[in-house]
Amino acid sequence: MKLIEAIDNNNLKEVIRIIRSDNINLESINDEDDLSPLHHAVSRGYKEIVISMLEHGADVNLCNDEVCSPLHIAIKNDNVEMVQLLIDNGADTDCCNNTIHGTPLQCAILNENYRITDALLESGADTHEIYTKNHPIIEAIKLDNLPLVRLLLRHGADVNTFDPLYGYPIHLAIRYGNIDIIKELLYHGVIESYSLYPSLLHQSIMCNNKEVVLLLISMGFDVNAKDNEGNTPMHLAVQKNLVGIVKILLDKGADTSIINNLSVTCLRSCYVYGNNSTEILQLLISRIVINKYANIPCRSIAGMNYNWSLIESNQKTNSYKLECEKEILKMLDVKIGSRSLFDIYLNKIESNMLLRLYNKVTLPEFIIYKDIIINAVYTAKERESLISKSFTVLEDTISNDTIDNLWKNIPIEVKYMILRYLGKDDLYNIVNSV
């Protein structure tokens, strides 16, 4: 075909001459390549020829037999300028007649082309409607592409839209484990609980993603939330034999007394499912025992009593309970004044006092509760470091004469006492102020 040959040669004059003299139908589709002349020119990236053809009446939204528009072709070729040219000449940014190519927006997202996606969105491309099988926000999450997710959210993509195959965007992001995308979705108003779907914390445990579990707990998600079967995150972690997540949940205050709809506690789950390690069983028992000694409130008295009877009814678990009690008594024996090492579990002891107590500890004597002690010591050292740095910052930066004289006249011990009243965030603010 002469016109196609002229386009291939980028011969604008010949293209114009053929169109005018041969009375060419610009909407005809070539049987060999399934392209119209405009499709062909766009695929070649010849802007001047495309402009001329549009001026001569070529349909900017003409679709070939595969239902692919010129805009789709420009997007697949990552040709930003051509995309903008077609949009400026009336290209439909939501054009889609089948499930193969999707909308131009979906096509741009699949190509992971940020600039083209931005151009389409600025021109009003629809972020909500699902013309094919996936929403644009779902596609961006599947690609693990944070910039595209942010771009879509900025243009109003619905974070609570439902996809029949992938569910809600937040559930998909949790399955993929992208922390930054999860944060973005939560920031933009994700509903924390969907009917017929597990809570976000349950979902993260089902995916065995410790980082996501920690993120959600840090953002205030209830560590003791129940799913439709009454299972808490701890029930689920025990059932799935996830030792690391069991440790996290215990450290974050998971209540082992809660019973599910079948009146089963998480401890009982160890026996019901029969696939759990001795480590999980001992983790639960050790926490149940220390919580009882510390008088930690629980949500279910019946569940607590059931756990206790379950432990004492078995020789091995009862023997382990006695070992736990021995270590607790050792912690109570390590004292300075009225404070004991056991107080670290209740968070009733200042960091400097805790470190003094730790100097009296023979750590190998504590096998069961060693991690609790080590974690408390780490936190105490971190806090002492913050206090020390805050003191240095204040000493170096207070310059006003009146304030300076007042500060210098305060005894060092009192200055440190003042700093000890501050929370972690306040101390960080002081340290980061210079």
From Swiss-Prot:
Pfam families: Ank (PF00023), Ank_2 (PF12796), PRANC (PF09372)
Alphabetical list of SUPFAM superfamilies matching this protein: Ankyrin repeat
ANK repeat residue numbers: 33-62, 66-95, 101-131, 132-161, 165-195, 196-225, 229-258
UniProt key word Secreted: no
Keyword Nucleotidyltransferase assigned: no
GO BP annotation list: proteolysis
Top-level division of the source organism's lineage: Viruses
UniProt xrefs under InterPro entries: Ankyrin_rpt (IPR002110), Ankyrin_rpt-contain_sf (IPR036770), Peptidase_A2_cat (IPR001995), PRANC_domain (IPR018272)
Keywords tagged on the record: ANK repeat, Repeat
Any one Gene Ontology molecular-function term assigned to this protein's record: aspartic-type endopeptidase activity
Name recorded for this polypeptide: Putative ankyrin repeat protein FPV219
Organism of this sequence: Fowlpox virus (strain NVSL) (FPV)
